[in-house]
From Swiss-Prot:
GO cellular component, as recorded: cytosol
Pfam families (alphabetical): DUF179
InterPro entries: AlgH-like (IPR003774)
UniProt cross-references to SUPFAM superfamilies, sorted A to Z: VC0467-like (SSF143456)
Gene3D superfamilies tied to this protein: VC0467-like (3.40.1740.10)
Coiled coil: none
PANTHER family in UniProt: UNCHARACTERIZED PROTEIN YQGE, UPF0301 PROTEIN YQGE
Protein name in UniProt: UPF0301 protein BT_1078
Similarity comment: family membership: Belongs to the UPF0301 (AlgH) family.
Domain of life: Bacteria
Length: 196
C-alpha cells in the first residue's frame, strides 16, 4: 500500500496577511496559547502585527469583570492573546459606535465603551454582535513573516458571520476544512496523537 508522505507536510498557502484576515495555526503547534487557534489580524504593518485569538473561550464571563453586567445573561469572554491580559478588547458589528476602528466591512474593534455598555444594558442582542477578549496577540517587525515562512500559520479570509459566531468549539477545524481537501487531513488529526 502506498501512503502519501506529503499529507502531513506543513506548507503555507501563501496568502498574504493583512488586517481582517485570519491566521490558522498548523496542527502540530504545541503551544498552550496558540495551539489549534484562529487569530483575527487587527493590524499588520512593517512595524509588526496585532491580532485576537477568536476561538479560545475563558472560564469566566464579561459579567465577572464589568459590575454593571452582573444581573444580565452571561456574556462569554475570550482569550485574545498573551499580551496585556488585563485589558479588555471587543469586536463588534455596530457601525455607529464612536471611535470604533474598522477591521473589515461591517466589523469593528473597540470604540466608546460607554456606548457598548448602553447597547447591552438596553437588552440588545450580544451574541453575533459583540465579542469580548482579554489580551491580544502581537508580533514584532518581521516576526509573523518568519513564522509564515516556517509554515506555523495559514492565512485565510472569513465572513464576519463566521467570525462572530458564538460556537467556537470547532472553529479551527472548520477554518481548515474551508481551505479545501489539501487541509482536510490536518483538521482530523488528533490534538494529542498518543491518545488516539
Amino acid at each position: 500500500m502506498n501512503i502519501d508522505s506529503d499529507i502531513f507536510k506543513i506548507q503555507s498557502n501563501n496568502v498574504l496577511p493583512s488586517r481582517g484576515k485570519i491566521l490558522i495555526s498548523e496542527p502540530f503547534l504545541r503551544d498552550a496559547t496558540f495551539g489549534r487557534s484562529v487569530v483575527l489580524l487587527i493590524d499588520h504593518t512593517e512595524e509588526g502585527s496585532m491580532g485576537l485569538i477568536i476561538n479560545k473561550q475563558l472560564p469566566i464571563f464579561v459579567n465577572d469583570i464589568i459590575k454593571e453586567f452582573k444581573y444580565i445573561e452571561n456574556i462569554p469572554l475570550y482569550k485574545g492573546g498573551p499580551i496585556a491580559t488585563d485589558t479588555l478588547f471587543y469586536l463588534h458589528t455596530l457601525a455607529d459606535i464612536p471611535g470604533a476602528i474598522p477591521i473589515s466591512k461591517g466589523l469593528y474593534l473597540n470604540g466608546d465603551f460607554d456606548e457598548i455598555k448602553k447597547y447591552i444594558l438596553q437588552g440588545n442582542k450580544v451574541d453575533r454582535y459583540i465579542r469580548f477578549f482579554l489580551g491580544y496577540s502581537g508580533w514584532e517587525s518581521e516576526q509573523l513573516s518568519t513564522e509564515l515562512k516556517e509554515n506555523t500559520w495559514l492565512v485565510s479570509k472569513e465572513e464576519n458571520a463566521y467570525l462572530m459566531n458564538g460556537d467556537t468549539k470547532d472553529m479551527w477545524k472548520q477554518a481548515l476544512e474551508k481551505l479545501g481537501s489539501k487541509y482536510e487531513t490536518w483538521s482530523r488529526f488528533p490534538q494529542v496523537p498518543t491518545f488516539n
